[in-house]
Amino acid sequence: MAIKKRYVKRLLRKVVLLLVVIVTVSLVTTLVVERRMKNAAELTEQLDPNGDPITPVFRAANIHPTRKAPRPPFQDRNSVVDIPRSDKLQGFRLPEPKGERKDWHDYAAMEADRKRSGFGEHGVAVKIENPDEKQLEKEHYEMNGFNGLISDRISVNRSVPDLRLEACKTRKYLAKLPNISVIFIFFNEHFNTLLRSIYSVINRTPPELLKQIVLVDDGSEWDVLKQPLDDYVQQHFPHLVTIVRNPERQGLIGARIAGAKVAVGQVMVFFDSHIEVNYNWLPPLIEPIAINPKISTCPMVDTISHEDFSYFSGNKDGARGGFDWKMLYKQLPVLPEDALDKSMPYRSPVMMGGLFAINTDFFWDLGGYDDQLDIWGGEQYELSFKIWMCGGMLLDVPCSRVAHIFRGPMKPRGNPRGHNFVAKNHKRVAEVWMDEYKQYVYKRDPKTYDNLDAGDLTRQRGVRERLKCKSFHWFMTEVAPDFLVKFPPVEPPSYAAGIIQNVANPVYCLDNMGKSTEEAVGMFSCADNRTHPQPNQFWELSIFRDLRMKGFDSVCLDVHEGPPNATVWMWSCHSQGGNQFWYYDRQTQRLVHGENNKRCLEGFVENGIAKVVANSCENGNDRQRWEFGFVNHTMLDTFYDGLK
């Protein structure tokens, strides 16, 4: 009986113990589940409106070595488009800025601008109507590369059109932003145009952010830019504008270095001396730098006409900066993942170079500009490569817009050095930063580069070693993944090349007439050598499906307007098709313009003058028939392969 009682007690203890274990496990399980549910709830609160997680920490240029993973997104409360969810294309966006946000618009100043009237106000074109002033107008034009007489008639405080995207007009930015030094460099700049650049910045920049304006006179020869400029600055901007004068011309790069050395702002903004900023240009430009000081930014560049000072929009869709293997600056479309919201900053491999912002400390940590780069040329590549390869990032900012005068024809100013300083600059950049890819630059022009001394590169190589910068292969594959497709390192064969002879007028061939870009193409007596004629008649239907001068990637045939008799311009090559798309139809011998196949190149002789136009394609019109010196039939068989 006693044994039975002990057995029952042990059994009860086991049952109780089992129950305790079950209860404990249940309790622990419940706690774990509740904790996970709580974490899930917290995570849900950190998703943006599109269901994508917010990345709280941002490391500049900390890009995964494969492009498969999406870039870290951040919540944009002002987004104007529906960014696709994770099962679709993921957009690149910066992290959510921390801190109070503010509307930086100066609405009173904007309203005052709206009420202005007069010559050139609101960016309206101005014409000189008085025939007695035409000669003076011509002289101003030749001296400046733009219409200086019109510039003198326009107020230095003129109003501009608001060219921003609608989303930019209501967006708020961090209330706490770094202050800036704006650095203008100039050489023999038109006085009123320089003043308008200064006033433009002062009038449209929050005064609490504008620490300083630096004017660097790079050895100007004109008297008006000496004591009269000093007096004007002292009278109107005594505590804001600093003038630095180089005793002799150092060029763009040396002048910028001189300006950077006296800059006291937390961020430096470098500008050419013939610009006008748009409304609220600064906050969107420097907010990315406030988020991460290793980001450099560029505004969207609008245009001020060199002919009539009209102010109009540039590329509204934006473009990424790049280069070809002749080291010519090129532009490419924005990457699809960066173009989902056209109002947000996007990545660009190379800056245009004339307008950009950079944290002052970061600029000097990168070694500034290579001070052995002479005059101009290559500086935008050197700085862009350094920014990306040494831990930074370069962004273009659509909500920040600055208009620039792109000079027209003017009297040549001469080579200040008497040698090819641009090629030497390019070789310095290639030797330090481009690694094995430099050979593709040299092979494009071995005569220039083979025996060219790049100078002492010790300091620049030391910068790269000190900062432990990435390889150029990393840059080409991660930052500029489409460059090798758009600009093959090994020059591909042409679809057709040589002379382009008009069938109706066989003594005439397409000719640049000794002119360059922004001029109409013409016809002249055909060269004797059909496949390798003199440069002015050496054309190619290139791999980019454009008609360009062989060996001169800066000149392509471009048609701006529709028929009849549309002018065929020689224009800077952009390698993007569109107005520069051409196809050679071997059966009809037509050079067809555009992908819609409706316009053809036409040559004719009128009153003894040979002309070239684009007209609607017509069967049986021999004036629209052309013969190349050489046709690559194998390549033409696949001309449309790969086109969308």
Swiss-Prot record:
Query: Please, which domain of life does this record's source organism belong to?
Result: Eukaryota
Phenotype seen when the gene is deleted: RNAi-mediated knockdown in the whole body or the digestive system and reproductive tract is lethal. RNAi-mediated knockdown in hemocytes, epiderm, endoderm, mesoderm, respiratory system or nervous system causes no defect.
State the Gene Ontology BP annotations.
positive regulation of secretion; protein O-linked glycosylation; secretory granule organization
Q: Which InterPro entries match?
A: GalNAc-T (IPR045885), Glyco_trans_2-like (IPR001173), Nucleotide-diphossugar_trans (IPR029044), Ricin_B-like_lectins (IPR035992), Ricin_B_lectin (IPR000772)
- A single GO CC term, please? Golgi membrane
Region annotated Catalytic subdomain A sits at 177-288
Q: Which reaction does it catalyse?
A: L-seryl-[protein] + UDP-N-acetyl-alpha-D-galactosamine = a 3-O-[N-acetyl-alpha-D-galactosaminyl]-L-seryl-[protein] + UDP + H(+); L-threonyl-[protein] + UDP-N-acetyl-alpha-D-galactosamine = a 3-O-[N-acetyl-alpha-D-galactosaminyl]-L-threonyl-[protein] + UDP + H(+)
Any one GO molecular-function label of the UniProt entry: metal ion binding
* Positions of region (Catalytic subdomain B): 345-407
Q: Where are the bilayer-spanning segments? A: 14-34
Ranges in the Lumenal compartment? 35-644
Q: Which cofactor does it need?
A: Mn(2+)
Q: Which PROSITE patterns match?
A: RICIN_B_LECTIN
State the protein's name: N-acetylgalactosaminyltransferase 4
